[in-house]
Amino acid sequence: MKRRPRGPDIPLLGERLRLLEEEWRGRRLDSDPLELPHRYAAPADREVVAFLSASLAFGRVASIRSSAERLLDALGPSPADALARDAWDAPRLDGFVHRWVDSRSLRPFLRAVGATL
């Protein structure tokens, strides 16, 4: 009679993952675009910032972060509100280029994001 392989020990795995998360929490986040949403307290702002950062997530990490920060500067202290009200500083994006994304393609994208909020 063949023996069935033993399944994963879910509680043990869960505990190991919790320990790893505690050990690594916050490490290297300062250089990662994932840090950007953590700057905002409002859940809507965090969601918008995470989405916009992910939308630019191609290329080198430093380049992604730099482009995302420039974009967020144009959106001001409450990106979700600025997009929803179409009240962001469009001229601040003049000359914006991230790989093949430029200000001409970014502006309608931001308006579409704002329309969904």
Regions found by a protein language model. Give the residues of each.
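HhH-family (HhH-GPD) DNA N-glycosylase catalytic core used in base-excision repair
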Residues: M1-L117
